[in-house]
UniProtKB/Swiss-Prot annotation:
Protein name: Mini-ribonuclease 3
Active-site residues annotated for this sequence: D17
First-tier enzyme category under EC: hydrolase
UniProt keyword tRNA processing, yes or no: no
EC identifiers of the protein: 3.1.26.-
Subunit structure: Homodimer.
Gene Ontology molecular function: ribonuclease III activity; rRNA binding
Compartments where found: Cytoplasm
Cofactor(s), by name: Mg(2+)
Transmembrane segments: none
Underlying gene: mrnC
UniProt keyword terms in alphabetical order: Cytoplasm, Endonuclease, Hydrolase, Magnesium, Nuclease, Ribosome biogenesis, RNA-binding, rRNA processing, rRNA-binding
Family: Belongs to the MrnC RNase family.
Length: 132
């Protein structure tokens, strides 16, 4: 197995973006929604840069992450990217990239239980926000 601690933050984010999106899509379909346009609209509440940055900031404020997880978040956040989200400022985009980097790291290191714990927390948090 590869030493994923050495992997570039953007490579971790590349994987994390896909993994998080799959979990969110699975969750939304499990709610019984089948219309693609509605699913896409619902997914943006979870997967947009703004949503991911907000979730990441809440995790950090709640001291939910281990020291190692924070390092992986910072690796993605601080990575030099030449692309930016269309609908987010640079800071929001970088925090979201850090979020995706953490998800990618947990997946690649086969920490499925921890990955699912954090994703389930994110789903619950977004649900609470949408109820307000």
């Amino acid at each position: 197995m590869r030493d994923y601690k050495q992997l570039n933050g953007l490579a971790l984010a590349y994987v994390g973006d896909a993994i998080y999106e799959i979990y969110i899509r699975d969750y939304l379909v499990s709610l019984g929604q089948t219309k693609p346009n509605v699913l896409h609209r619902m997914a943006t509440h979870y997967v947009s840069a703004k949503a991911q940055a907000s979730l990441m900031q809440a995790m950090l404020a709640g001291e939910m992450l281990t020291e190692e997880e924070e390092v992986m978040y910072k690796r993605g956040r601080n990575a030099k990217s030449h692309t930016f989200a269309k609908n987010a400022d640079v800071t929001t985009y970088r925090v979201a990239t850090g979020f995706e980097s953490l998800m990618g790291y947990l997946h690649l290191t086969q920490q499925k239980e921890r990955l699912e714990e954090l994703i389930n927390w994110c789903i619950k948090k977004v649900g609470e926000t949408n109820e307000k």
